[in-house]
Amino acid sequence: MKKTILFIFLIIPVFVFAQEPTKNQIKNAEKITNYVADKHSLSKKDKKIFYDATLNQIVTNAAEIKRQGITDSEAKKVVYRKGYNNIKETLSKKFGNQKAVALLKSGNEARRK
């Protein structure tokens, strides 16, 4: 009983304080996803998986930078690299390593446009 109550009190703040994506983050994730989906002919299901992973990475990176109060571009690169590795791992589980890398390269192309 104590473990259950403790678990509930520890898990609630995770959901209450979880950061919601901003309109710009959603727009950015949609732009990247649409570009990648068109280039690689992703199914709707695969497109949704890629969108969720991309949006999660964008939101997580922004939250981590804000949490740490990072302003230095070199320090931000460390956060972005960690986020890249996380999304690569997620996509590799679904699509395989080679396709995941190709999708992420296309995602980087979309960011530059």
Model-derived features: where do they sit?
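Bacterial Sec-dependent N-terminal signal peptides
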Residues: 1-24
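Charge-rich (acidic/polar
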Residues: 19-113
